[in-house]
Structures are given as structure tokens and as C-alpha cells.
Design a protein with these regions (language model features):
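Generic alpha-helix initiation/capping and coil-helix boundary signal
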Residues: 13-15, 166, 282
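Sec-dependent N-terminal signal peptides of Gram-positive bacterial secreted proteins and lipoproteins
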Residues: 4-27
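Domain-terminus/edge residues, biased toward the C-terminal soluble/receptor-binding domains
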Residues: 178-182, 190-195, 199-410
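Short, compositionally biased leader-like segments
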Residues: 20-41, 329-344
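Active-site-adjacent loops and short helices of periplasmic peptidoglycan-processing enzymes
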Residues: 2-5, 26-212
Length: 410
């Protein structure tokens, strides 16, 4: 009698699994719990309520952004195309650091000097054909003295030639959404069609600061030497000695561009980027950057984002060999940009399903975290799966069923 009941139980369970799998296959996505946020969703830019004043800026174009969120805090003619002089070297530096991150170069890699690099005009360290420096030394020359010959030598190392490297520069600019930028060379000398905007410069600057923070090791150097002390390097960014919290980033001056700067600064966890293009003099360039940064630090603050203490660390998964999937809250920023006078408390509200349906892939968005200041929504960020949970195959299900039945019979 017991053997008959066991056989009937087995037959019933097998039929159930066959029906469930067949139904799931026929219905496809209809059986699966849909994520609250679509997969790979981008964090929303924070909503800010501060009305910026009319600043007096002695330049053709300017923009001030929060480095962490990308929020625009002030802008003036930010989409007007114009030459950007040696600020071009920010893209040269970005591609170089990315080559280092990819393992193609190290800071000890020897950088040869070609005839082409030797003939660069403008600011330089007077490289000689056949002379070699390490990449570390060349980066100092670019970041501190804005050396055009060093920038071209590095571009040739990374891209094979300057024209090939310029193609990489334009491709990377397109990837970053720099819609009004076209590069014609790696150093920023005035060339027809070599144009950008204050907004695009801010995008480029934010990218290198967020993804290659080691650039600040070089942009923060005030003085250094090369050739065993024979060549003196003095930083062209005088704000390093004049402005509290300045960290970089790059100056630029040509006849076509005027006097320019993209300046990065940090105070009390608030990281700002001020871009000034087309100032009539170096003095007015630094004055404009100072005005922008002073406004930003006075009008805004960086508030720590509190993660809910009782947040779920994992979610249950149906139809998988994995019972649960761990959750990744890394998209939530550590700090949030708030108006300085804001008295509201930051909170995080989570929207997550009770369970997930397999398959689940690592990095898939499974919910969202809403950042609030009082009742005002400051931003929304994806909550992602931190591991895979593959869909259980029919054979695996039968094996698990058989093992469980054998255990029950024993």
C-alpha cells in the first residue's frame, strides 16, 4: 500500500512539473515578475530648486557642475562652440589613463619623441627627437607645464600616430555625449574645426575625475623638474596657490580660444567643476572660476545618503537552482547635492518585489531606491542583482525531485 501511494505521489508531482514547465515555456515572459525599473536603468539627475543669480563673469562661456551627480548649477552660453586651447589635453589624458587601466601601458613605459612631436609650437618642454621619458614624466609635463610636445608624443604612443589618436578622441567624445565637440589635434593648438563647448568640457572633465582620479596626483603638482633637475616645471593653474580646495584641472590659452580653464575643487565632500572659456586675460580667467566656485560652495552642500538599516540584502527566486539572489545598492551615491539652506532630512525609499522569477542575471535591475529630502524627490537609482540565478532545467528539477522522494522513502 505504501509503495502504491509513493508511486502515485511521484506520478502526480512529475505531472505537475511537466505542466508547469510547459506552461512556462508557452507563456514565456508572462510568467516572470517584471522588474520595477527596466534593466540597466541610469540614475536620474537630482532635482534642484535653487534659482542661480546673475553672475558677472568676464568670459565668453562658462558652466558650473556638481562632479558627483552631474547637476548643472550655473551656465552661461554653455552650448556655444569655440576653441578650447590646451583644455583639449583633458581628452588626451583620459585616453592615456584608460590605456593604463587596460594594461596596455604603465607609468614606466618609455615614450619616444618623434620629429612630429619635436616640431610642436606653443608651450613645451623642448623635447629632442630620439629623447625618451617615462610616461609618468610626460604626464607631469602635460599636467603641470601644459607641454604640447609631450602631449603629441604621448598621443603617438597611445594611438600609433597623432591622426589615429585624434580619431580615438572624437570617438570617445561621441560616447560621452559631447555633441558639439570636434578634435583636430591632441594638444589644443588653434586649428580650423577644432571646437567644443563649456558643457562638453564639463562632461569630459567630470569623466576623467570620476574614472581616473589619479589625474589629480599630477594636476595638483605646483612645481617639479625633469632631466635631473635641468628642466623646471611650474603649474599654469595659479588657483593651486590661491583657492582653498582646488585640485586641478587644466588651463588653456591660444589666440583663437582666449584664456580658459576647467577648474576642479572640493570642500566638505562637495566636488565642483567650473569651466571658463574665452576670458580676455589670465587674471580674469581665474576671477571667473573663483566666482563660480564661490557661488557653488555657498549655495550647495553635500549631505550623506543614509542606507535603510532594514534593507533586504537578498530576494527569493522562483524556478532557479539558487534560492536567493544578493542585492547591490552601489548605484546609490554616498552623498547627495542639496541647497545649503535645506533643512530636510535625507531618506531612501525602496521599491522591491517580494520574489523574482528565474533567470536573473548579475547587474539586472530588480528594483529602485528613491532618494527623498523631506517629501521632495531628489533622484532615483537602480537596485541590481549581485549574482546570477539561472532558470532550473527540467532534468535538474527531476533529479531534485527524485532525490527528495528517495530521502522521504528512506
Amino acid at each position: 500500500m505504501e509503495r502504491r501511494n509513493l508511486a502515485l505521489l511521484c506520478a502526480g508531482v512529475v505531472c505537475f512539473w511537466l505542466f508547469a514547465l510547459a506552461f512556462g515555456t508557452a507563456q514565456g515572459k508572462g510568467l516572470r515578475i517584471q522588474p520595477v525599473v527596466q534593466a540597466q536603468a541610469e540614475p536620474a539627475v537630482q532635482t534642484l530648486t535653487v534659482t542661480p543669480p546673475q553672475l558677472t563673469l568676464p568670459c565668453r562661456a562658462a558652466i558650473l557642475i556638481d562632479q558627483t551627480s552631474g547637476a548643472v548649477l550655473y551656465e552661461m552660453n554653455a552650448d556655444q562652440t569655440m576653441p578650447i586651447a590646451s583644455i583639449t589635453k583633458v581628452m588626451t589624458l583620459l585616453l592615456t589613463f584608460e590605456a593604463v587601466h587596460a594594461g596596455r601601458l604603465t607609468m614606466d613605459t618609455a615614450v619616444p619623441v618623434s620629429e612630429h612631436a619635436y616640431h610642436m609650437g606653443g608651450s613645451q618642454i623642448w623635447l629632442e627627437p630620439g629623447e625618451q621619458f617615462t610616461l609618468d614624466e610626460m604626464l607631469k609635463a602635460i599636467c603641470v607645464s601644459s607641454a604640447n610636445d609631450a602631449a603629441v608624443a604621448v598621443a603617438e604612443l597611445v594611438g600609433g600616430s597623432e591622426p589615429a589618436f585624434v580619431q580615438q578622441m572624437n570617438a570617445r567624445a561621441a560616447e560621452l555625449g559631447m555633441e558639439h565637440t570636434t578634435f583636430r589635434n591632441a594638444c589644443g593648438l588653434d586649428t580650423e574645426g577644432h571646437l567644443s563647448t563649456a558643457r562638453d568640457v564639463a562632461i569630459m572633465s567630470r569623466t576623467i575625475l570620476n574614472t581616473c582620479p589619479e589625474v589629480l596626483h599630477y594636476t595638483g603638482i605646483w612645481t617639479d623638474t625633469l632631466r635631473g633637475g635641468q628642466t623646471q616645471l611650474v603649474n599654469t593653474n595659479k588657483l593651486l596657490r590661491r583657492y582653498n580646495g582646488i585640485t586641478g584641472l587644466k588651463t588653456g590659452t591660444t589666440g583663437g580660444a582666449g584664456v580658459c580653464i576647467t577648474a576642479s575643487a572640493t570642500r566638505d565632500g562637495l566636488n565642483l567643476i567650473a569651466v571658463v572659456l574665452g576670458a580676455p586675460s589670465s587674471k580674469e580667467r581665474f576671477e571667473a572660476a573663483t566666482t563660480l566656485l564661490d557661488y557653488g560652495f555657498a549655495a550647495y552642500r553635500a549631505a550623506p545618503v543614509p542606507l535603510p538599516q532594514e534593507r533586504p540584502l537578498q530576494l527569493k527566486v522562483k524556478g532557479s537552482t539558487e534560492e536567493t539572489v544578493p542585492l547591490d545598492y552601489a548605484a546609490l551615491p554616498q552623498t547627495a547635492l542639496l541647497p545649503a539652506e535645506s533643512a530636510g532630512q535625507l531618506t531612501v525609499q525602496l521599491e522591491l518585489p517580494d520574489t523574482l522569477e528565474a533567470p536573473v542575471t548579475r547587474g539586472q535591475t530588480v528594483g529602485k531606491a528613491q532618494l527623498l529630502c523631506g517629501e521632495a524627490v531628489q533622484g532615483e537609482y537602480p537596485v541590481c542583482a549581485a549574482a546570477d540565478a539561472p532558470r532550473m532545467e527540467f532534468g535538474t528539477a527531476l533529479q531534485l525531485l527524485w532525490d527528495s522522494l528517495r530521502g522521504a522513502a528512506a
